[in-house]
From Swiss-Prot:
The lineage of its organism: Eukaryota, Fungi, Dikarya, Basidiomycota, Ustilaginomycotina. Residues 296-310, 544-570, 663-675 have a biased composition (Basic and acidic residues). It is found in: Nucleus, Nucleolus; Nucleus, Nucleoplasm. Residues 285-294 have a biased composition (Low complexity). The keyword Nucleus applies. Component of the NOP7 complex, which is required for maturation of the 25S and 5.8S ribosomal RNAs and formation of the 60S ribosome. This is Pescadillo homolog. Belongs to the pescadillo family. It comes from Malassezia globosa (strain ATCC MYA-4612 / CBS 7966) (Dandruff-associated fungus).
Length: 684
């Protein structure tokens, strides 16, 4: 006879554990448990049957997987928390006894822990760590710009700023930056590293106000994890580029505000590979050559990967030959003895390259003219021919003091501008190699009014606003500078992270400028209204011409009075947007505020009357459109009948999809109405 199953020993009751039970099992406080879960990546779970998981109770509870909590029991950081708890007791006891020397010794020997094993567990491969780098970079840049406070020491801010500078130095070195967008929240950057798109947000360099409702203990735990992760990633990236990590910091230049100039890239020689850690400083030309010289000979000549493969093949052949012949130490050539001079090495490289080249042989079913496969060598050649990384290489820039120098120096150098071709005002920091009166300057970046400012400098320089640099990067070409001159109204700054073609395909709103760039049909939202206005004007002109052709003076006087009255009437875009979309959320409130500011109570009463009439006509149009289109009603009826055949889950999903589509259409109509109102106000 089978054993009777007891309640609560299997199923959801066994697979899930509450948070209070987890605290008792681990014997730690709630704050330590939260910290441990953040570091290990464990988060609450929602069981399908809460009552079964909670053993019959319906009280609101937080659940975790039982296996996750058992996994935490063997965590070394958990033991470090317990050691720190014992350490705190000893320090408090020494302070209570006024044993200051003992308390100082205890504080100097406080228990420490490392997160290296957690990084290796959470990110088994390097690509996994790159995929999770977005939040890490955004958090580091955030803390690098936050002023130090009671809960955050100045050393933490300095460490975050150092990691951010090292990351930006790598991006500038490899020219992997691809997109930049200036938004209200900050500046969005995107770089492609090892085939992975990494996007991060950099706040503007304003004085940050620390919010009081943010739990900095949780934020500091995330920051601790991200600092360790960033150290691992940067070490791997610098090592792949044959650079020594961390780069050497010149403290004197750093104290003078030199920025990236205070970090010096060091190339790793052959002695580094053998463990002698010989370093040599290098300039930009040497940095460009360093990654290709990752393996060198003893005499300093370059040893390519093909040379290593060729020598391994020779050693393998000699070993096979030695199995059948008597052993002879002199017959085994050494690696250094087989190396020829530089000229013969180049010829051997060409031969080896030809031997290693992939040759596509025609199969029996396909002819010789079939398409060849794309190889890694072809992809590398295509990547090397991309002109975008060297977009600004032929120009010399000067950054004015009101422009954020660190941000635009990073953008310019990431797209080919040499450090010797980027200068800034001495107020922004030391290290500028271009003076304000340098004749070589081709682009002077300004972001302030130019009234009363002298713009006469030697040479042929162009004064531009900062948006020109970002728009050139997103357009992947050098744009004309006339629309970006100081004092000019800037063109729309479109986001490069939005696929406008896909948005247009799904029926979303696409700006007119984006449509022109994509070559789509110009969907001008003000065209219909303009045609109606023109027709009305033509009818009025015909009526006037038919009723009183002889009284031309009176007609001209009436037209002049109408023009003057129209000129005196203030523009009210919020009212026009409300009348175009009377059901739009927030439009009524904006129109009321606008009416109070322009005309007071009379304008407010007039607004409410117009809104009521517009709302009534809108409902009437909606009602007539449903009654006057039998084809649409038949389609709706067929849709409802098909909807009854769906399951409950599918029906809910279909309803949510319809609601999302309706919201998208409403948003598109609202934006089109806003665009229509703005275009009318711009008319002379």
């Amino acid at each position: 006879m089978a054993r009777i199953k007891k309640r609560g020993e299997s199923g959801a009751a066994k697979n899930y554990i509450t948070r209070n039970q987890s605290l008792k099992k681990l014997q730690i406080t709630l704050a330590e448990f939260r910290r441990l879960c953040i570091l290990k990546g464990i988060f609450p779970r929602q069981p399908r049957h809460v009552k079964r998981a909670n053993k019959g109770s319906t009280a609101p509870t937080t659940f975790y997987y039982t296996k996750d909590i058992a996994y935490l029991q063997h965590e070394p950081v958990l033991q470090a928390f317990r050691d720190h708890k014992a350490f705190a007791k000893k320090v408090n006891r020494a302070i209570a006894r006024r044993e200051w020397h003992a308390a100082k010794n205890l504080d100097e020997n406080r228990p420490k822990y490392r997160l290296d094993h957690i990084i290796k567990e959470r990110y088994p491969t390097f690509v996994d760590s790159l995929r999770d780098l977005d939040d890490a970079l955004s958090t580091l840049f955030l803390f690098a710009n936050i002023p130090s406070q009671k809960s955050m020491a100045p050393e933490i801010t300095a460490h975050c700023a150092r990691l951010c500078a090292e990351w930006q130095l790598y991006v500038m070195r490899t020219h992997c930056l691809s997109k930049v967008f200036l938004s209200i929240k900050g500046i969005y950057f995107q770089a492609v590293v090892h085939g992975q798109e990494i996007t991060w947000l950099v706040p503007y360099m304003f004085t940050q106000t620390i919010p009081t409702d943010v739990d900095f203990r949780v934020m500091m735990t995330f920051l601790e994890l991200y600092q360790t992760l960033m150290g691992f990633v940067l070490f791997k990236l610098y090592t792949d580029e044959n650079l020594v990590y961390p780069p050497k910091l010149d403290e004197s230049l750093d104290n003078q505000g030199a920025g990236f100039g205070s970090l010096m890239l060091m190339a790793a020689d052959a002695d580094v590979l053998t463990g002698k850690h010989s370093l040599r400083p290098m300039d930009d030309a040497a940095a460009a050559e360093a990654s290709s010289n990752a393996i060198t000979r003893k005499d300093g000549k370059k040893l390519s990967t093909r040379d290593v493969k060729r020598q391994i093949a020779q050693l393998t052949r000699s070993e096979d030959k030695a199995e059948h012949e008597p052993e002879d130490d002199e017959s085994m050539p050494a690696l250094d003895a087989t190396m020829q001079d530089q000229d013969s090495d180049e010829e051997a490289d060409d031969e080896a390259g030809a031997a290693d080249a992939f040759v596509a042989h025609a199969s029996k079913t396909q002819g010789a003219g079939a398409d060849q496969l794309t190889t890694l060598r072809d992809l590398q050649k295509q990547a090397g021919e991309d002109p975008l990384p060297m977009l600004f290489s032929r120009y010399v820039f000067y950054i004015s003091r009101e422009v954020p120098r660190t941000v635009f120096e990073f953008i310019l150098r990431s797209f080919g501008a040499s450090p010797s071709n980027v200068g800034w005002d001495p107020v922004a920091g030391a290290g500028s190699q271009v003076a304000v009166d340098d004749e070589r300057v081709t682009h002077h970046i300004l972001d302030r009014p130019v009234d009363g400012m002298s713009l006469d400098h030697a040479g042929h320089r162009v004064y531009i606003q900062p948006q020109w640099v970002v728009d050139c990067v997103n357009a992947r070409q050098i744009l004309p500078t006339d629309p970006y001159r100081p004092g000019q109204t800037l063109p729309p700054h479109l986001s490069p992270f939005v696929d406008d073609r896909e948005v247009a395909r799904k029926g979303g709103y696409v700006p007119e400028e984006a449509r022109e760039k994509l070559g789509l049909e110009a969907e001008y939202v003000g065209g219909a209204d303009e045609d109606e206005d023109e027709d009305e004007d033509e009818d009025e002109d015909e009526d006037k011409a038919g009723s009183g052709r002889g009284d031309d003076k009176n007609v001209a006087a009436r037209e002049q009075d109408a023009v003057e009255k129209h000129d005196k009437t203030p523009a009210r875009p919020a009212l026009e947007a409300l009348l175009a979309d009377p059901t739009g959320a927030g439009l009524l409130e904006a129109a009321e505020l606008e009416a109070e500011a322009t005309g007071g109570e009379d304008a407010l009463l007039d607004l409410r009357a117009k809104h009521a009439a517009s709302l009534k006509s809108h409902k009437k149009k909606k009602r007539t459109s449903t009654t006057q289109s039998p084809q649409l009603s038949e389609e709706a009826e067929a849709r409802d009948m098909a909807k009854t055949l769906l399951s409950n889950k599918q029906r809910k999903l279909y309803t949510r999809m319809g609601q999302a589509t309706g919201k998208k259409k409403e948003e598109k109509m609202r934006l089109e109405a806003k665009k229509r109102a703005l275009s009318k106000n711009k008319k002379p």
